[in-house]
Structure formats: structure tokens, C-alpha cells
């Protein structure tokens, strides 16, 4: 098993540019001067009243989530003084006076990703911003917190552990500094760089002892008992400004055909992937931070974004937080059972990597990797070339688009072969050989589906079935075979069809409410 970024995180969830307070805020989600007729934005696309019902994703949940996010945003804003006090305590910043003060920027300039709300905090001296920090809170309604209390803390513990692991084992990967973090119960931790000299020395000695004795990795974070409680988990991160780099997605369209820039990008991504996979892992799962002794251990379930999305949509939990795997078969078996349960519990069931998390300079040299959530120790077979290299998502990779991606895939793996000569791997796994074999055998499509919410619908027909049969009647054959999926299949399908009808009725009701509120 090797450490991998399992799935996409929050697109644009950190601040690349800070607008002046007089600038126009981010555009609203329910209106656009370029659209006509009733509708709304969903994941950057305009949906009409009619097309919303044809979406594979659950639009009812999306509307409810947006409303809940607005309430959570206001809840955080009402606690802005506490947020400023927490930042001040963790970083030992001076108290506000006539010249210095700490300001939480108004909500219209905050950034919301798929799973987090990012609050920008600015230190002002003489009316000018001198320091900027990102106070990031997980969204309770996106992390199944009401169904499974403690999931937000689980996410923070795993994300913090990813920072600690990379700080220790991959110092060549530039990531934002994690200054501090806190949990739901009010326990908070601060990086030892903010501690007095004597405590820093003592911590260094303890970490050395842990290494010598083979104990779990001791982090560089100490408990902080002076910071006020917020009432929600959080992480306090370094603000990464344009002087470090800009999101690759900002210049992607402009330079996508520049061979030299792409070569530098491929080299950079290869270095990151090889650095993360340099050390073999003992099991399939996630590292997690242990508040009792501030160590990290590989003792959490594989926390994939797909898992959280399904659990948040009322799919029963299949893998418990403390469950890890020693072999691929048992992990795969539980994941397939999880997909079965998702189908049974999704009322709308009868119907990935991201270039925004990479910061680059003008020449596309990678300068920083952001959003370390969803990093897992997964089977090496799941390692794959990023599907977005040709500006297409996995379900779009057919015909000429597939041929184009295959060409870029080969170029990417050639770049990785070159980088392998410069990376000291502590195992004898032939990474690029496995990645090439996964493509040839078409296993790559299967593993892509395992990490996805709904790619099964597209990739099976386009890529997996043709490996076994090309005859036109295979779809009918599969329908007949599906009757032995489990007992009472006909009744299950009829029930799902009734649920779909009720879903469409409720969706139209919600959409009318949305239009009336515009």
C-alpha cells in the first residue's frame, strides 16, 4: 500500500487573491446575467427547471445543503470576535490597539468548497494588511455529522495527520503551514514553533526518543488551553498568496498546448506522487492524529470523499472509523457492499482529481500543494495518471478523446520514469510498470469507479464491458443476470421507481420555492 491523494478535495477552497473591501464580492449562486428563464447554478452549470430533474446527482440535497451553508456562514460570522481571539491565542499576536488589530473579513469574501468554509483573517497595522490567515471549518451538513456524530472530528484528525506525515517524510513537497487546529469538544493544539524555547527543545528530544524506540510518530503540536472555544472543529492555515503561485486552473486553458509548460508540470506531479509513495504502508487506511498523546498512527478507515458523500446522503455506514485493511480483497468487498447500500437508500438512484489544488508559477513549475484532505494509504493498483490532463473528465474519455489522453498518459509516465531515477524508493515496487499494466488490463477504469460517486454509469459500458464482450446483446444479458443480485429484485426496482417519482415531485416544489425567493 502507498500513500495517495484519493479523490478531489475542495476546488478553490483557499484564497489565491484577496479583494479589496471595495471590490465586488463573488457572484451569487442563483442569478446570472447570461441566463434566461427560471433556473439556478449547480456546480458551475446553469440548470433549468426541466433539466434539474435529469441530473444524476441529488439536486434536492444540493438545494438543502446550500441553504444550510448560508446559515452556517452566518453562525460563523456571529462568532467572528471569538475566531479572531482564537487566532490571536494560537499565534501569540498582540491585542488590538489604535495601530494594530485583527480583522475577520466579511462573509461575501469567504470561500466555500465542497466540504469546508474558509474564513479569511487579516492582521492590520496602520490600516494596512501585514499578515493573512485561513481559518477553515468543515461543513457539518456535508460530512454526515447529524447521522454519525464525530465525523467532522474524524476528518480533522485525518487531515492533520496528513500534514504531520508530509512534514516529516516529504519535506520536498511545499504545503501550507498548519499553525493550529481544534476539535468539537474544545481541545485545541498549536504548532511548537509558537511555544517558548525550552518547550521546543523538550519536544525535539521527545520526538527523537520516539524515533529511536520505534514508537508512533510524535507530532509538533502541543495542547493549547488558553484559546477560547469556538464550538466547531477547525484548522488554522497559512494564507498562500499569488507571490507563491496561482491555481493551475487559472492558466490551464491559456497554456494547455504549451509542450514545455506541460513537461514541467508532469515532472512536478510525478515528483509529488513518487514522494508520497516512497515509503510502503502497512495497511489500507488513513493516518489519524491522536489527541491524547499527539502522535499519528495508521489506524483510521480509508476516508474517501465518496464515502462521506454517500453517508451524508443517508447510506448506512459500512466501514467503521477505526477499521483498516491488510489486503485489497477485503477493502474492495466492503466498498462494493457500500455501493449496493447506496443504491438502496438513494431516492434518486434510478437514473475526482482536480487541477485547482495545485499551485504553479508562470512556467508551470509546481510551487505548492493545497487541500490535503482525503489522503489515504490505498492499494498501489489505484495509483493512476490524472484524468484531467487533457481537459476531460473520466466519462468523457472515449473515441478521439481517449486516444488523446492515452498519448498524454504515455508522456506523463515517461516523465515519471525519469523522476524515478532521482527518488530513493524504500520498496521494490515498479510503480510505472503497475500503472501501465493497469491501463492495458483496463483495471484503471474499475478503480476509478471505486473512488467515484457515479462513474459506474458511464465507465462500465464504455471501457469495462468491451473487455469481455463486444456483442450488441450484452446489455440485455446483464439485465437478466441482475435478477440474481439479491432476493426480491423486482420489488426493489418498483420501490426505487416510486421513490424517483416522489423525488421529482419534491424537487419541483423546492425549485419553485427557489425561484420565488430570487
Model-inferred region functions:
Residues 357-361:
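Conserved protein-kinase catalytic-loop segment immediately C-terminal to the catalytic Asp
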Residues 195-224, 243-247, 252-255, 283-356, ...:
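Intrinsically disordered, low-complexity intracellular terminal segments
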